Each structure stands twice: as C-alpha cells, then as structure tokens.
C-alpha cells in the first residue's frame, strides 16, 4: 500500500498514516483465509473505513482541516492481485516478455485531458497542473475507489508508487530499472535515488513485489 498525504507536511503525514492504520484495522477484522471470498467488497469496506477516519479527523481537528491522501493498494492472493486506487498514486504490472503496463488511472486534471485526447502522456508529466487531483481519500464523507483484477505469472512484478516517482521517470525507465535492477529491495533504492536526483520531493514511495 502507498498513501501520499496532502494538506501541508504535518497534516499530510497524519492523513497518510491514519489511512493506512484504518485500512488495516478493517482488513484484519476478517480472517485472512476469508479474504478471497469477495475481495472487491472487502477492499471497498477497507477504503470506506480509512476515508471516514481521515475525514472525521479533518473536520474535528483544526490542525488537519482540508487534509487528505491518495491511496493505491494491492491484495495478492496466490496468482490473483486485486488493486484499488484513489488519487494519483499508481500501480504498474511489469512482465519481462511484455514490458510495463499501468494498471491504474489517475484521478487528476491532466489524466482527464489525456483521456479526452487533449494531452499526450508525455506532456502530462510536465503539465503545470499535474499535481491537481480530482479525488482523494478523506476529502469528503464518501469516497469512490477504482478496482482492478490481475492475474500474476511467475516472474511478474507489481509496483506501487507515489507521484514523486512517476512525475520524474517515464514508464519505460521504470520498467528497465525493475527488470535489470537486481533484487527488489535494491531496485527500490535505485528508483528512489533516480527520482530524488531529478528533483523529486522527499516523500517518494515505492513498493515492489515479485511473483
């Protein structure tokens, strides 16, 4: 799971931490052996619980007014991965024989322009409004998340990241580093170093899983 908080440094950190903790609290209320029974319903409940926790804190704590967070998460059960996202943190599937595939679609101003054919993916990375998101966890009393189902093959990589990475590196660069970067931990460190060297903020987050 990756959450990228907003609303100032302090409030953003609170939002992202609270979202993760609340999500896991709801998830752990159901026995792990039952997670596969209805994963979409389970993930939706987890997101709704996290959203309520962040939203209630934002309206009752003056220091947290207006805070929110993105969220991208994956529930991996054997060869199946169930991915959710809110905001502009991303999930990628990287397969050596096929390259990289972006699984999620950003809830952002520039993504809407891309989907309408008014902006290319490359131009979107440098657009002045690239950081404006249209959906965030905790921004309102209810939240809608997007859900995706994947089948993972042996050797596949599933990468989750905040926009600090995707704003600095294009998909092909990410794919190359994952496929040629060695062990997953080493690869994550390399991706973080590259993003930071190109001017990414301190809160770049990457999670990498290999099947």
At which residue positions do the language-model features occur?
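PP2C/PPM-type serine/threonine phosphatase catalytic domain
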Residues: 1-211
């Amino acid at each position: 799971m990756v959450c990228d908080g907003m609303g100032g440094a302090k409030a953003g950190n609170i939002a992202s931490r609270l979202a993760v903790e609340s999500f896991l609290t709801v998830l752990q209320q159901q026995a792990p052996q039952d997670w596969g029974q209805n994963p979409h319903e389970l993930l939706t409940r987890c997101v709704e619980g996290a959203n309520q926790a962040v939203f209630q804190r934002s309206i009752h704590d003056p220091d947290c007014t207006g805070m929110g967070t993105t969220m991208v998460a994956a529930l991996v059960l054997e060869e199946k991965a169930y991915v959710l996202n809110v905001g502009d943190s991303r999930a990628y599937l990287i397969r050596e024989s096929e390259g990289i595939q972006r699984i999620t679609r950003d809830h952002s101003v520039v993504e809407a322009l891309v989907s309408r054919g008014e902006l290319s993916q490359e131009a979107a990375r440098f657009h002045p409004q690239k950081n404006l998101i249209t959906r965030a966890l905790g921004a309102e009393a209810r939240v809608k998340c997007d859900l995706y189902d994947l089948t993972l093959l042996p050797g596949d990589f599933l990468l989750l990241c905040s926009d600090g990475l995707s704003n600095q590196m294009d998909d092909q660069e990410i794919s190359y580093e994952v496929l040629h970067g060695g062990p997953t931990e080493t690869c994550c460190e390399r991706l973080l170093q590259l993003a930071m060297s190109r001017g990414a903020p301190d809160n770049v987050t990457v999670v990498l899983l290999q099947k």
